[in-house]
Amino acid sequence: MEELQGYLEIDRSRQQHFLYPLLFQEYIYALAHDHGLNGSIFYEPMENLGYDNKSSSLIVKRLITRMHQQNHLIISVNDSNENGFVGHNKSFYSQMVSEGFAVIMEIPFSLRLVSSLEEKEIAKSHNLRSIHSIFPFFEDKLSHLNHVSDILIPHPIHLEILVQTLHCWIQDAPSLHLLRFFLHEYRNSNSLITPKKSISLFSKENQRFFLFLYNSHVYECESVLVFLRKQSSHLRSTSSGTFLERTHFYGKIEHLVVVLRNDFQKTLWLFKDPFMHYVRYQGKYILASKGTHLLMKKWKSHLVNFWQCHFYLWSRPDRIHINQLYNHSFYFLGYLSSVRLNTSAVRIQMLENSFLIDTSINKFETLVPIISLIGSVAKAKFCNVSGHPISKSVRADSSDSDIINRFGRIYRNLSHYHSGSSKKQTLYRIKYILRLSCARTLARKHKSTVRAFLKRLGSEFLEEFLTEEEQVLSLIFQRNSFPSYRSHRERIWYLDIIRINDLANHS
């Protein structure tokens, strides 16, 4: 019990009390609207978002003043010539302040992460996992486990839950009131923080703001798993964010300790499973174990009850699916993963006698869900729902080489991401769709037929759809001497993969 209390102990001195005045500092908005920050994988460039570099502390002060008035964010006729924002609606002003507000709200998380590193609570960056730690887990661990649970992260039943979550980090009342205003201003934000939505699908106008809310929500949901990982040396945690694994329960300590004081030691043995593994990416995570089905059901029951009673999160039991790895494929990271039992007969000769011995080996397989992938390609308007390629509309000033490079790059990126698949032949259908869609697009542009266009381009057109592996192998090996089937059956996990491919993210 003392260990639990020590883990949950709050350091009140680190809570931030004076964040609200930062809203009136111009450098905050320079950070929020900087090209370098917004040019990352999560943010679109500034010109795509519609910023016009006219942010100033004076305008921000006026906007915040209007927030406290009855008709907030309504620009009067007299102010139209003064502020220079003629033609912008109120969403722009709220967007501008919310982006700066998100930068400010990230400060407590950043300070805690830095202080943890200084106190050597985090050995190097072992706890700051990424998508790359999931790949070796699949290769080395999963084939030795029996059961897997697919779990969708529960979402709040009310927007106030998000405010209460951040209240444990921040004691600045004006900042929390402003957060409430933003949440009610964008009422659809509750639908954005759902398990089926990925981080990359957030609203482009407020990506930083909603990404911060999503991470703080996941941060809270993972708190119980982080503590249990400390109780079991084999409970691995993988996360796609930097600060998501450093979790404290904060304001829930007293209630949590009172509830668990009597029966915590009785139930802790349940979680000390030396073969339990936890992996999360975006809005979905899995629990895999070598234990029995009964153990997995107990995990499910405790997680649901814990989230509902102590975090006030709505977590339906039907969102947690328990299945055996041997006869069930689960979807994760754009793959259909499963464990198959491969049997083989070995003939042993001993003197004059010979024996046939059947051996069984667990083999981990990752397959490309071709039907769902075609659905994603159809949603991107490269084909119809039945997989028949169609032409896409292009700009009149686009050159043929630019169009071909665009289609070829889409396929190479998709093939590069699915290089970890056990059977890459299924991607041939996607190559056919993209190649013919490109040909139809070019034929439509030149008002010609697909047959005539392909005849004119010849092999130059086909080479654009070769992957990097195929290009290298074609230079090193003769086509008739290299066993091509091996290149389609070997899994390769590339370290430059930092997030799930957009077309593969069809969940």
UniProtKB/Swiss-Prot annotation:
One of its GO terms (biological process) is mRNA processing. Its main location: plastid. The keyword DNA-binding does not apply. The keyword Oxidoreductase does not apply. GO terms for molecular function: RNA binding. It holds the Pfam family MatK_N. GO terms for cellular component: chloroplast. Keywords: Chloroplast, mRNA processing, Plastid, RNA-binding, tRNA processing. It comes from the Eukaryota. InterPro entries: Domain_X (IPR024937), Maturase_MatK (IPR002866), Maturase_MatK_N (IPR024942). It is found in: Plastid, Chloroplast. Usually encoded in the trnK tRNA gene intron. Probably assists in splicing its own and other chloroplast group II introns. PANTHER family: MATURASE K (PTHR34811:SF1). Belongs to the intron maturase 2 family. MatK subfamily. This is Maturase K. It comes from Liriodendron tulipifera (Tuliptree). The gene is matK.
